[in-house]
């Protein structure tokens, strides 16, 4: 069976930047180009490529354009801090370096990087290709299935935790991947500014889903709930369904590139070395020059 690696570009670029943010101050002090995210992201992705024999490789990014989620819910992600300008200027170079490494780098207006990952994951598994997804975003856990594993960064840029069908319940509150969006519909998600239902915390949300399975089934059994829960949930099904929908990753968008274009390409060594030299990333330049 062939293997695909799908990477959440925004998520890992953020992690690469903030794991090495001290180097930004050094660059400012010495009037050097910002390169910490470029170097760290490139090294992370190179190491991931060495971890398994991958046949396909896709790295997805968000665009600046509003998504369908923004149009449905104006408060979506509204509390997130602005991306540091020192990272923003590195993102185009990060993308260029990853193309030189052999990845298909993609983005589509109207959708988030997660939606591209979800749609490429579905495309791969439909073609009997096993998928590894790398991110620090727990939203992607909903994509775990018999052919798809999700690896989340848990510490810095090196420590990863794998979620698969064998260990998922143990690592995610006893729930299933399909219940991730049900959980977010009830409990919410602060990182995306999804409030969930006021009065339903993680423990109560988990208990309800373990007993009833889905939001629809919880409300179908409304009369069996305690009076306290009935008071909390009264008239809230539309709210829960809205936040569940907003948390759902699309797996059926029309992709700009097909599976053939997602095949990993040979490293463009010359272009990569020129980029590393331009941005003063000498140690990596030396490493890749020896390949």
From Swiss-Prot:
SUPFAM superfamilies: 5' to 3' exonuclease, C-terminal subdomain, PIN domain-like. It comes from the Bacteria. Pfam families: 5_3_exonuc (PF01367), 5_3_exonuc_N (PF02739). It is an enzyme of class 3 (hydrolase). Residues 176-269 form the 5'-3' exonuclease domain. One of its GO terms (molecular function) is DNA binding. GO terms for biological process: DNA replication, Okazaki fragment processing. Its EC number is 3.1.11.-. PANTHER family: 5'-3' EXONUCLEASE FAMILY PROTEIN (PTHR42646:SF2), FLAP ENDONUCLEASE XNI (PTHR42646). This is 5'-3' exonuclease. It comes from Mycoplasma pneumoniae (strain ATCC 29342 / M129 / Subtype 1) (Mycoplasmoides pneumoniae). The lineage of its organism: Bacteria, Bacillati, Mycoplasmatota, Mycoplasmoidales, Mycoplasmoidaceae. The gene is polA.
């Amino acid at each position: 069976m062939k293997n695909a690696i799908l990477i959440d570009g925004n998520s890992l670029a953020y992690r690469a930047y903030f794991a090495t943010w001290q180097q930004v101050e050094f660059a400012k002090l010495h009037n050097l180009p910002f390169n910490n995210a470029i170097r760290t992201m490139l090294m992370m992705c190179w190491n991931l490529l060495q971890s398994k024999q991958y046949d396909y490789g896709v790295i997805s990014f968000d665009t600046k354009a509003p998504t369908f989620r923004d149009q449905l819910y104006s408060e979506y992600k509204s509390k997130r801090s602005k991306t540091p300008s020192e990272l923003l200027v590195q993102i185009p170079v990060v993308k260029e370096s990853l193309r030189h490494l052999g990845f298909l780098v993609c983005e589509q207006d109207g959708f988030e990087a997660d939606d591209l990952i979800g749609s490429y994951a579905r495309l791969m598994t439909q073609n009997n290709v096993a998928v590894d997804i790398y991110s620090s975003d727990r939203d992607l856990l909903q994509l775990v299935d018999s052919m798809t594993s999700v690896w989340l960064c848990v510490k810095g840029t090196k420590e990863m935790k794998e979620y698969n069908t064998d260990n998922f319940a143990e690592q995610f509150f006893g729930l299933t991947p399909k219940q991730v969006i049900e959980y977010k519909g009830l409990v919410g998600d602060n990182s995306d500014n999804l409030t969930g239902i006021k009065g339903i915390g993680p423990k109560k949300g988990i208990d309800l889903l373990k007993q009833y399975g889905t939001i629809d089934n919880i409300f179908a059994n409304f009369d069996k709930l305690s009076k306290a829960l009935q008071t909390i949930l009264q008239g809230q099904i539309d709210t829960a369904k809205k936040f569940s929908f907003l948390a759902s990753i699309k797996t059926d968008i029309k992709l700009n590139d097909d599976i053939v274009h997602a095949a990993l390409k040979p490293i463009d060594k010359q272009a990569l070395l020129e980029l590393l030299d331009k941005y003063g990333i000498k140690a990596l330049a030396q490493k890749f020059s020896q390949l």
